[in-house]
Amino acid sequence: MEASALKAWELDNNVQLVDPKRDALYNFDADAQKAINKEQPWKQDPSHFKHVRISATALIKMTMHARSGGNLEVMGLMQGYTQGDTFIVTDAFRLPVEGTETRVNAQDEANEYIVEYLDLCRAQGRQENVVGWYHSHPGYGCWLSGIDVDTEAMQQQFQDPFLAVVIDPDRTINSGKVDIGAFRTYPADYKPSGGVTSDGFQAVPLAKAAEFGAHASRYYSLEVSHFKSSLDSHLLELLWHKYWVQTLSQNPLITNRDYGNKQLLDLSSKIKEATTGITRNRAGQGMMMGMSTKSSDKAVDKLAKEANLIASKERSGLIANQVKASLFNDLGSKANPTSE
C-alpha cells in the first residue's frame, strides 16, 4: 500500500524517473549556456519557450514553502538552465520577503540574500544560474496579476531567460496534486497572433474576479512537467516510508477546512451579485422581461460550474474518508476476535 501510494503521487504530478544516462539533466554546461545566451533565440520569437521541467526536489521545496505561508503570499527563486525551448529547473530557494494576502515584493534584504546564496552555491561547485521566480496564490489559482506581469516583464528585460511560476497551496491540499503554472510575458509592443488566449475556467474569488484575465494578452503559459534523478528516487522512498501513514490519516476536508469555508462564502457572494444583476437587467428590459440575456446565462453557467467543482471536491473527500474507515476501523477486531 505504501509503494502504491507513492506511485499514485508521482503519477498525479507527472514525476518521471531519470536514469543514470538521463541524470545529465543535472550537469550544467557553462559553455552551452554562454552560446545560448549569445544567440538569444527568444528575442526573435517571444513564444520561443514552451516547456518547463522541474525537478522533484525543487517541486517539493516550492510546495512546502508555499504551504508554510498560509494565507500570505511567499516568494522564492529557481535555479537551472535552458535547453532548446525548455527551462530545466534543478533547485529552488526561498527568499526572506514580506508578503500579504494579495501581493509579495522583494526588498533590499532579499537582494543581499540572493547574492550571498548564489556565491555560496558556486563555492560548492553548483554553477546553475537563476532562471525564474516563484510565488504563491493561496486559494485563487495559478495566473498572473498586474503586479506579477510587471515583475516578470522587468526580470525578462534585464536578465532573460526568466520565467514566473505560481503555486496555489490551498488547491494543492484540496486535490492532492500540486496546483502549479508557469508563465512568460510578451514584449510591450508585441501582440500575440490568433488573439488573446484565456486563462481557462478557474474558480476565482470575487475579490480577484476583476483582475483575473485582465492581463491575459500580456503573457502566456508554458507546459509544466517534473522529473527525478536516481538519488531523488531513493530520497523520496525514504521520505514516503516515514510519512505515508500520516498522509493516509489526513483528511483534506479537515486540513483545508478554512479554504472550504472561504469557497462557500465566496460562492454565496457571487450568487447574490448575479441575482442582483439579473433582476436589474429584467427590470430594465420591460416587455422582454421573460428573456434572459446572454451575459446572464454566462454568469449563471459559471456559477453552476463553480458549485459543481466545490461539490465534487467535498464528495471526493467524503468518499476517501469512508474508504479509509472501512479499511482500517475493523482491523483490530478482525485480527483479534473476542470470544463471548
Curated annotation (Swiss-Prot):
Motif placement: JAMM motif: 135-148
Gene name linked to the record: RRI1
Keywords attached to this entry: Cytoplasm, Hydrolase, Metal-binding, Metalloprotease, Nucleus, Protease, Signalosome, Zinc
Q: How does it assemble?
A: Component of the COP9 signalosome (CSN) complex.
Task: Specify whether Transmembrane helix is a keyword of the entry.
Answer: no
Q: Which InterPro entries match?
A: CSN5_C, JAMM/MPN+_dom, JAMM_MPN+_peptidase_M67A, MPN
Q: What is the lineage of its organism?
A: Eukaryota, Fungi, Dikarya, Ascomycota, Pezizomycotina
What Pfam family is a match, any one?
Answer: CSN5_C
PANTHER family associated with the record = EUKARYOTIC TRANSLATION INITIATION FACTOR 3 -RELATED (PTHR10410)
For this UniProt entry, what is the primary localization, expressed as one broad class? cytoplasm
Where, by residue number, does Zn(2+) bind?
Answer: H135, H137, D148
What the protein does comes down to: Catalytic Component of the COP9 signalosome (CSN) complex that acts as an regulator of the ubiquitin (Ubl) conjugation pathway by mediating the deneddylation of the cullin subunit of SCF-type E3 ubiquitin-protein ligase complexes.
Q: Where is the MPN domain?
A: 52-189
Question: Which GO cellular component term is one of those annotated?
Answer: COP9 signalosome
Organism listed in the record:
Gibberella zeae (strain ATCC MYA-4620 / CBS 123657 / FGSC 9075 / NRRL 31084 / PH-1)
Q: Which protein, by its recorded name, is this?
A: COP9 signalosome complex subunit 5
Biological process, per Gene Ontology:
proteolysis
Record remark on domains: The JAMM motif is essential for the protease activity of the CSN complex resulting in deneddylation of cullins. It constitutes the catalytic center of the complex.
Which family does the UniProt entry place this protein in?
Belongs to the peptidase M67A family. CSN5 subfamily.
MF terms from GO for this chain are: metal ion binding; metallopeptidase activity
Write the Enzyme Commission number(s) for this entry. 3.4.-.-
Give the location in the cell.
Cytoplasm; Nucleus
